[in-house]
């Protein structure tokens, strides 16, 4: 990796991505570290998606979806909250900062809230030490690879 931060943001189509789109139309700049991934619903984002993003080089992952209780797919965002909590516990169990995985909620009409969430995630990741990678000599090197492998993913 080139030393630049990389954050993958899984954004639901109905709210978070709509808020991101509106903020882009208003020419509000997002940190260059953030890569948006459009998903139909945050309920479709599983633990393996989050762990694979980290194993493939992301320094942090965020899931951004509808306000709790207002998911367009009924309970998708509640499922996402549970999955993010699971991944945070898993990361902590292998010696990786759980702050690298976070969940944010907003409505489509809240572009400033989306921008604030992305900037907050960027600030948090910037304050953390670099994520150990496979080839590093740190004790937690390859921890995300180990976490992914422990879930039966090659």
Language-model-detected regions and their locations in the chain:
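Iron-sulfur-associated redox domains of electron-transfer enzymes in respiratory
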Residues: 1-154
């Amino acid at each position: 990796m080139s030393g630049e931060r990389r954050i993958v943001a899984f954004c639901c189509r109905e709210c978070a991505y709509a808020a991101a789109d509106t903020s882009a139309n208003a020419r509000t700049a997002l940190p260059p570290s953030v890569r948006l991934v459009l998903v139909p619903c945050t309920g479709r984002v599983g633990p393996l998606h989050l762990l694979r993003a980290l194993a493939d080089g992301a320094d942090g992952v965020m899931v951004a979806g509808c306000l709790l209780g207002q998911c367009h797919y009924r309970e998708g965002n509640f499922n996402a909250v549970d999955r993010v909590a699971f991944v945070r516990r898993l990361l902590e169990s292998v010696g990786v900062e759980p702050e690298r995985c976070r969940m944010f909620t907003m409505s489509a009409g809240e572009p400033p809230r989306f921008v604030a969430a992305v900037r907050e995630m960027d600030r948090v990741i910037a304050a953390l030490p670099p994520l150990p990678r496979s080839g590093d000599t740190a004790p937690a090197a390859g921890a995300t690879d180990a976490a992914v492998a422990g879930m039966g993913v090659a």
